Amino acid sequence: MIQSQTLLNVADNSGARKLMCIRIVGASNQRYAHIGDVIVAVIKEAKPTSALKRSEVIKAVIVRTCKEFKCDDGMIIRYDDNAAVVINKDRNPVGTRIFGAIPLELHQNFDKIVSLAREVI
């Protein structure tokens, strides 16, 4: 579960390395974000040569959480880290590669992210 002020790793090659969640998009009173939710985040750490710079406000989609996630088929998945993928206004990923495992449930809303991922669970 991701809430405000949570630090996340970035699971793509957009240039950002660490994000901090500042808002959950979608509901005004929603406290926690889960896998597949869109968040507003600020870049806390970035590669020096990237187009994305530190303290930029961006949107990202959650792809991995430490909290258990129950799949549609009943399987329970837990990851080692909290991670997100940076997206643009059209909800397409900014990066061209996705690192790490991605759940298949993202296919419903973020088909492009699932197609870029090497590991889909």
Swiss-Prot record:
Keywords: Chloroplast, Plastid, Ribonucleoprotein, Ribosomal protein, RNA-binding, rRNA-binding. PROSITE patterns: RIBOSOMAL_L14 (PS00049). Gene3D superfamilies: Ribosomal protein L14. It is found in: Plastid, Chloroplast. SMART domains: Ribosomal_L14 (SM01374). One of its GO terms (biological process) is translation. One of its GO terms (cellular component) is cytosolic large ribosomal subunit. One of its GO terms (molecular function) is large ribosomal subunit rRNA binding. PANTHER family: 50S/60S RIBOSOMAL PROTEIN L14/L23 (PTHR11761), LARGE RIBOSOMAL SUBUNIT PROTEIN UL14M (PTHR11761:SF3). Part of the 50S ribosomal subunit. NCBIfam families: rplN_bact. Binds to 23S rRNA. Belongs to the universal ribosomal protein uL14 family. This is Large ribosomal subunit protein uL14c. The gene is rpl14.
